Swiss-Prot record:
GO biological process, one term: antibiotic biosynthetic process
Annotated family: Belongs to the short-chain dehydrogenases/reductases (SDR) family.
Protein name per its UniProtKB record: 1-cyclohexenylcarbonyl-CoA reductase
Gene: chcA
pH-related activity note: Optimum pH is 7.5.
Residues that bind NADP(+): 22-25, 71-72, 98, 165, 194-196
MF (Gene Ontology): oxidoreductase activity
Temperature dependence: Optimum temperature is 30 degrees Celsius.
EC number: 1.3.1.120
InterPro entries: NAD(P)-bd_dom_sf, SDR_fam
Tree of life domain: Bacteria
Matches recorded under Pfam families: adh_short_C2 (PF13561)
Gene3D superfamilies associated with the record: NAD(P)-binding Rossmann-like Domain
Disruption phenotype: Deletion mutant loses the ability to synthesize either cyclohexanecarboxylic acid or ansatrienin.
Length: 280
């Protein structure tokens, strides 16, 4: 027996909204879905030229697409993004919460503004976006959030983003239960060391051991690719994943099994700064 989502995908072109879709994993996913003949909404914050280039590539790959400028760090931006989708498409089949940003600091150096912005950039857009997506998924759909290895392992200076990713994975489980009666599946994809343009920012921070030393300890002996991440997300968006919900799929080449980097790998670089005092 086909689910509502399976029946609708057989009858019409699927509409997929991807935040942060002008580069990296988001762009690769957009092209992957385009090759399936879908309509892709390319959300971007600043670089209109890059977003329009992605739209052109989507159309060359056999799909349809359009770009929407919206800063999802603001509640107004999230609302404007989904208003545009509602006006132009009238419905939504897939919502992929991909955009992310963070500062990388020791916990004792974080100020209230860092915490507020991390919440506003990473967690709130996913929750508010999911609320809006449900209203447009009148016949079932799929929601996928991007997570990372830092949600389950402690990296130097990664607490702020890792904490947000852990929260996202928790929200995925709650949403899966609440949205199931609507025929909507909600999952997360947790990437390890993925060879993307973001890896430079997310990994190369003070206190991390050399990346090659970590790669040598991963069972797969290499970083993942953005295409491997996109293929996993696309699987969760497809009919073959109809009975998967509330889960976090790990794409890390075995990284989390052996759990590097080890503290000993970093040596003195992992030493904590002096304990702050109230007089400091």
């Amino acid at each position: 027996m086909n689910s509502p989502h399976q029946q609708q995908t057989a009858d019409r072109r699927q509409v997929s909204l991807i935040t942060g879709a002008s580069r990296g994993i988001g762009r690769t996913l957009a092209l992957t879905l385009a090759r399936r003949g879908g309509t892709v909404v390319v959300n971007y914050k600043k670089n209109a030229d890059l977003a329009q280039k992605t739209v052109a590539e989507v159309e060359e790959a056999g799909g349809q697409g359009f770009a929407v400028q919206a800063d999802v760090e603001t509640t107004e931006g999230v609302t404007a993004l989904f208003d545009e989708v509602a006006q132009r498409c009238g419905r939504l089949d897939h919502f992929v919460s991909n955009a992310a940003a963070s500062a990388f600091k020791n916990i004792v150096d974080l100020g209230p503004h860092h915490l507020d912005r991390s919440y506003a950039m990473n967690l709130r857009p996913f929750v508010l976006g999911a609320q809006q997506a449900v209203k447009l998924m009148d016949n079932g759909g799929r929601i996928v959030a991007l997570s990372s290895y830092g949600s389950v392992r402690a990296y130097p200076t990664y607490a702020m983003l890792g904490g947000m990713k852990a929260a996202i994975e928790s929200w995925v489980r709650y949403m899966a239960v609440e949205f199931a009666p609507y025929g909507i599946n909600v999952n997360a994809v947790n990437g390890g060391l993925i060879d993307s343009d973001s890896l430079e920012f997310f990994y190369n921070v003070e206190g991390m051991p050399p990346m090659q030393g970590v790669l040598d300890r991963i069972p797969a002996r290499r970083p993942g690719t953005v295409q491997e991440m996109a293929d996993t997300i696309a699987f969760l968006l497809g009919d073959g994943a109809g009975y998967i919900t509330g889960q976090t799929l790990v794409v890390d080449g075995g990284l989390s099994i052996v759990a590097p980097p080890f503290f000993a790998d970093a040596g003195e670089a992992l030493e904590l700064p002096p304990r702050p005092t109230r007089d400091a």
